[in-house]
Amino acid sequence: MAGALEGLRIIELAGIGPGPFAAMMLADHGADVIRVERPGARDLMGGADPLQRSRRSLALDLKWAEAVDVLRDLARTADGLIEGFRPGVMERLGLGPDVLLTDNPRLVYGRMTGWGQDGPLAQAAGHDINYIALSGALHLSGRAGDKPTPAMNLVGDFGGGGMMLAFGMLAALIGVQR
């Protein structure tokens, strides 16, 4: 798809919520996004996921050395990478920022974690419902006297994390070009 980001290549390591949302927005504006997913992952989805539109996909089992080599080759020619694994996973796979930025110093390495890279919740899974509940925003939904009615991924995953990830990626990509 043609757009303002045409000519940029982004690697998206498949995840849920904010990472795919950010990659979708970049792809919708013309970036060439390559979604890397586990073999068989599409079969588990049971149909089309609208967050996966506008991009190609590649199945790689990153626990295999050959697949890690393929991803490193892709990253050498990419402008950006989006990953949403828990802290330390990419490093254990040999694909952390220290490795990929040595291979490609101009690579914008976008990390999306629920609770950051360190701190008391860093290793906990992060999901939209957790963020809006912990922040108090869930209290604002629903009717007085009833249980809260959670929004579907709109507040934390999309409006917060995914939007900020896409914006941060764009800012860093502009910075690299200057």
Regions from the language model: what does each represent?
Residues 25, 29, 93-178:
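Active-site-adjacent "lid/gating" segments in soluble enzymes
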Residues 11, 34, 58, 108-110:
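Hydrophobic/aromatic beta-strand patches that form the interior of the parallel beta-sheet core
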Residues 15, 62, 86-87, 113-114, ...:
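Short glycine-/small-residue-rich Rossmann-like dinucleotide-binding loops
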Residues 2, 48-50, 122-123:
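Short secondary-structure boundary/capping segments
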Residues 41-53:
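Conserved N-terminal glycine-rich FAD pyrophosphate-binding loop of Rossmann-like flavoproteins
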Residues 5, 72-76, 124:
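A short, aliphatic-rich alpha-helical micro-motif
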Residues 11, 51-102:
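A structured beta-alpha segment of the ubiquitous adenosine-cofactor-binding alpha/beta core
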Residues 2-41:
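Conserved small-residue-rich beta-alpha loop and adjacent elements
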